[in-house]
């Protein structure tokens, strides 16, 4: 597993710095035979939420171009969108995990809270590089977000 820092201080969007990209490449070159799960906070592809996609990873094409040299990086995991996703991205699997707090409603133009319960994603990393995963959510109404909030 490699955890990349996509935070840009003081702004909501993400970007992988030159340092992070070089560090990732050094790590991947050191163990080319190992499967690697790549984790980062910001989503590298459009989520379908106009308001949220302006806060995505700003240099996803740079990341994708670098990863072509490393076929054993077959799964990426991100957060930030507070939604559950399991999609293909440049020939790899991209997972997004729900938030353990407030969920954002999918496919919205403006900020919208979803009434889906907080959740988390369980991962089982298999020796052949596959990732088995399941999303779990709180089963009761212990957590109810303020549906009228204009930001979280």
What residues fall within each predicted segment?
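Short acidic, glycine-rich surface-loop motifs adjacent to enzyme active sites
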Residues: 31-47
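Active-site-proximal beta-strand elements of phosphoester/diester hydrolases
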Residues: 1-8, 37-39, 92-98, 134-136
């Amino acid at each position: 597993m490699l955890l990349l820092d996509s935070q840009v201080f003081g702004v909501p969007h993400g970007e992988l710095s030159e340092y992070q990209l070089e560090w990732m490449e050094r790590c991947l070159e050191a163990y080319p035979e190992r499967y690697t799960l790549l984790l980062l906070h910001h989503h590298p592809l459009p989520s379908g939420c106009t308001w949220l996609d302006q806060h995505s990873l700003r240099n996803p094409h740079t990341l994708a171009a670098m990863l072509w040299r490393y076929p054993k990086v077959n799964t990426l995991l991100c957060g930030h969108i507070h939604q559950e996703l399991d999609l293909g991205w440049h020939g790899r699997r991209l997972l997004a995990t729900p938030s353990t707090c407030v969920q954002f409603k999918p496919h919205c133009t403006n900020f919208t809270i979803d009434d889906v319960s907080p959740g988390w994603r369980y991962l089982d990393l298999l020796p052949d590089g596959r990732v088995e995963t399941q999303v779990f959510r709180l089963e009761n109404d212990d957590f109810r977000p303020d549906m009228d909030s204009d930001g979280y």
